[in-house]
Each structure stands twice: as structure tokens, then as C-alpha cells.
């Protein structure tokens, strides 16, 4: 989909300005390298050096690209002159210009987005060119290119926020594994290409975790710190918030109490963590106004971050003192119930959207998610059509490794459904069940005879 968007812009005869952004390791550079194949493309990777050093490096890159020794020797040539020279080169092909890690230029010189805006307005926008600004510091990229206050606001013709690879594609990376095994790997790697590459060795999951995460010298041991340190200034306070959420404090008030800080100090930090796709705010799908609902809860959205804060961060003293086996024992006892089970619920909710689009469910819904309320009642899946209160679908997800789902679990789901008041007067209730180990014969017979029961 992302490649199609870039290709469509390339084939369009008018100029385009694309913003591509997303957290580190998700494959932005690989995407752009693939896109550039066979094209008249200039790729420049910005650095954290001064704006003058970057300009000189960009001039060298452009001189190599054009084979222009005059440009190379023009030590005083600024950004505008370099772009003017690039555009003056005759070519039947569309010119592609990519500036990767664009945010470093704005960090080195706060005026650079304004400089680039002028270059776009006076030179680029009327030429046969596709410009792609790419960056991995999400918050900074949003400020410099997408926010209303940015000089580039309104100039972009498209944007791509590159995210992790969905679970549905994991069979391409681990084709020899069973679905149960693939889910275990997804629960740790979370769709990040670099992490998948590290774990793609065909070992047993716990051996892979020990080698790649539970060893102080391993690539992923300090990964969350590395990711956050580049995005925020006060990494300690952000770590505390994530740790609190990982411990089960999901409401803003609970997070504040656990950290002994005022509630009013949290909204900005929570928004930043949501912008980074580390946290997300959940609201029961039956709520009338999602944005203003007081039932909002926060959860860790990133599988690896959730895994790390549950199993690595609390055990670092053991790991660093040479007793990783203690941390591994804790992992073995808690990995499935305290982590994989929740990841499996996410997978099932994603599958709900696929089934919905394919017309394989009793009605078309526009909201699906986890529901909570009543006296500590929680339902894994509730799906509704907000414009029609006559139907509602309830779902249960179980990652039983060796046990089939039983009729008793359907009965429990039906009992919990009674706590949901949405459309209760005249609604038709449907129930969908997901279980990684399958279903009992009783459930199969019931699903065959009752159209209100669906086995996912």
C-alpha cells in the first residue's frame, strides 16, 4: 500500500511532496531504497552535524549525482542553488529527491523548514519532481512537516506513517512454524522488521529471547531506552509512565496515584507516547463520544515495549549480575498468561475487521474493541454499528495452548454480555469465539445449528 502511494505520485505528471515518517527499525529506508530502483533518484541521509556540514555533504552528493565538478567546487553554494542546479539538468525521467532523517536539518537550524518551504514554492512545485522527506523521530517530524505551525503545513501532497508489519504477514517470515509459534514470535517482535530479522533463526522462542533480549550485550536489551532517548528530553518520567501502565494502571488517575504526581501533569506526556505508538487510549465501543468519554484507559500498544517492561525492566538486576536464569524462569511462568494472551486478543480484533470487510459476519459494524464496565466485567470483543442499535456482537479470545474452548466459556460470555446496556431493549445478540487450539465438539455442533454462534 505504501509503495503504491509513492508509485502513484511518481506517475502523476505534477510535482509531489511526500512525508514518510515512523519509529526506528520499521523499514522506512528499505521502502525508499526499493522505490528508488530503476529511477532517476537522489538519496541524501541527513546527519546530526551542523546545517553547514549537511549542506556541504548534500552539495557533494548532488555533484556526484549530476557529475558536475563546477557544483562540487562551489563551496559557497547554498540549499537554493543546489536545488536549482539539480532541476536545471535535462532529463526525460521524473527526478526523485529523498532527504532521509529530515528532522536533523530542522534540529540543526530551526529556520530550515522555512528555507525548504521557499525552495518548494519557488522551484520545486512546478517541476517534474517527487520530493520525499523521511524521518524516524516521530514527534520532531510531526512538528517540522505536519503540524499547523510548520512552514511546510499545506505543502505536502501525501504522507505515510509507516507502522509495524501486521501479524497476518508473519507466515511469510516464519512459514515452517505453527500458528501458535508464530504468535509467540509476534508477541515479542511486534512486527518490527529489524526484530524479526534477529529472531528469524529457527530457534525455540525462549532461546531466541535469551540471546536477543536477556543478554546485557544484546541488540534489544536497551532498545526502549534508545528509542525514547531520541524522542523525549525527560526519559525518566516517560519510563515511569510506561512502567505504571505495564503494571496495570490504565486510568489517568491510577497512573498519577502510582507515581505520586498530579493528574494535570500527565496529558501532555500521554499524548506524546500515543503519537509515538507506544501507548494508545482505549474506550469501550459502545461509548457515545469516544473523544470525551471518561471511561478511557491507556494500554501499551507496542508488543516489544510491553514485553520489555513486563519481563526485562523489572529483572535487570538479576540479568546484569549474571543470573538471567531467574529472569527466564519468571518469563516462562508469565509469558503466556500475562503477555501472549493479550497479544492474541489484538490479533483477533484485527481479524474481526477482515471478516467484517469480507462480509462474513451477521452485520456490518463500524466499531470493535474491548469492553469493560459494570462490576469488574470485561469482554474481549464487542462490535456494534453506531447507526443501528438492533445488532451487537460479543467475542471471547483464548490462547489455550493444549485445551479446546468449551461450551462453558460461551455461557460465561453470554452472562457477561448482559452487563452491556447498548440497545438492550430490542437487540439481536451474536457471539464469536476465537481459540488457538480449536473448539469442543459441543461448540462445533452448536455453531452449525445456531446462526448466532460463530467460531472464528
Please place each PLM-identified region on the residue numbering:
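A cross-kingdom feature that marks ATP-driven nucleic-acid transaction machinery
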Residues: 292-456
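Phosphate-binding site recognition
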Residues: 1-329
Amino acid at each position: 500500500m505504501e509503495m503504491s502511494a509513492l508509485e502513484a505520485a511518481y506517475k502523476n505528471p505534477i510535482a509531489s511532496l511526500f512525508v514518510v515518517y515512523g519509529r526506528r527499525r520499521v523499514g522506512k529506508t528499505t521502502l525508499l531504497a526499493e522505490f528508488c530502483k530503476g529511477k532517476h533518484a537522489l538519496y541524501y541521509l541527513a546527519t546530526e552535524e551542523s546545517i553547514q556540514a549537511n549542506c556541504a555533504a548534500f552539495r557533494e552528493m548532488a555533484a556526484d549525482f549530476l557529475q558536475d565538478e563546477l557544483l562540487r567546487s562551489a563551496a559557497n553554494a547554498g540549499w537554493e542553488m543546489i536545488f536549482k542546479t539539480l532541476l536545471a539538468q535535462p532529463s526525460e525521467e521524473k527526478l526523485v529527491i529523498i532527504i532521509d532523517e529530515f528532522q536533523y536539518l530542522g534540529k540543526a537550524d530551526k529556520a530550515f523548514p522555512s528555507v525548504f518551504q521557499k525552495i518548494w514554492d519557488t522551484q520545486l512545485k512546478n517541476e517534474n519532481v517527487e520530493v520525499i522527506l523521511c524521518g524516524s523521530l516521530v514527534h520532531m517530524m510531526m512538528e517540522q512537516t505536519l503540524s499547523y505551525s510548520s512552514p511546510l503545513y499545506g505543502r505536502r501532497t501525501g504522507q505515510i506513517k509507516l507502522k509495524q508489519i501486521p501479524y497476518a504477514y508473519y507466515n511469510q517470515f516464519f512459514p515452517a512454524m505453527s500458528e501458535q509459534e508464530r504468535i509467540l514470535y509476534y508477541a515479542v517482535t511486534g512486527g518490527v522488521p529489524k526484530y524479526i530479522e534477529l529472531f528469524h533463526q529457527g530457534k525455540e522462542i525462549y532461546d531466541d529471547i535469551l540471546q536477543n533480549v536477556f543478554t546485557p550485550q544484546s541488540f534489544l536489551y536497551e532498545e526502549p531506552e534508545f528509542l525514547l532517548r531520541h524522542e523525549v528530553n525527560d526519559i525518566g518520567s516517560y519510563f515511569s509512565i510506561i512502567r505504571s501502565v505495564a503494571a496495570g494502571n490504565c486510568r489517568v488517575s491510577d497512573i498519577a496515584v502510582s507515581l505520586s504526581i498530579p493528574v494535570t501533569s500527565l496529558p501532555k506526556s500521554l499524548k506524546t507516547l500515543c503519537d509515538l505508538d507506544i501507548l494508545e487510549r482505549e474506550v469501550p465501543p459502545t461509548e457515545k463520544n469516544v473523544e470525551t468519554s471518561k471511561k478511557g484507559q491507556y494500554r501499551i500498544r507496542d508488543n516489544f515495549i510491553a514485553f520489555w517492561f513486563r519481563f526485562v525492566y523489572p529483572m535487570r538486576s538479576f540479568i546484569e549480575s549474571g543470573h538471567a536464569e531467574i529472569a527466564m524462569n519468571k518469563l516462562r511462568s508469565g509469558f503466556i498468561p500475562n503477555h501472549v494472551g493479550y497479544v492474541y486478543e489484538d490479533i483477533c480484533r484485527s481479524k474481526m475487521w477482515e471478516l467484517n470487510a469480507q462480509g462474513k459476519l451477521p452485520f456490518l459494524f463500524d466499531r470493535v474493541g474491548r469492553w469493560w464496565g459494570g462490576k469488574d466485567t470485561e469482554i474481549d470483543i464487542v462490535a456494534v454499528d453506531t447507526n443501528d442499535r438492533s445488532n451487537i456482537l460479543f467475542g471471547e479470545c483464548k490462547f489455550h495452548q493444549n485445551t479446546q474452548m468449551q461450551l462453558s466459556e460461551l455461557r460465561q460470555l453470554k452472562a457477561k454480555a448482559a452487563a452491556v446496556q447498548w440497545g438492550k431493549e430490542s437487540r439481536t445478540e451474536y457471539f464469536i469465539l476465537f481459540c488457538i487450539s480449536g473448539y469442543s465438539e459441543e461448540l462445533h455442533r452448536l455453531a452449525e445449528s445456531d446462526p448466532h454462534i460463530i467460531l472464528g
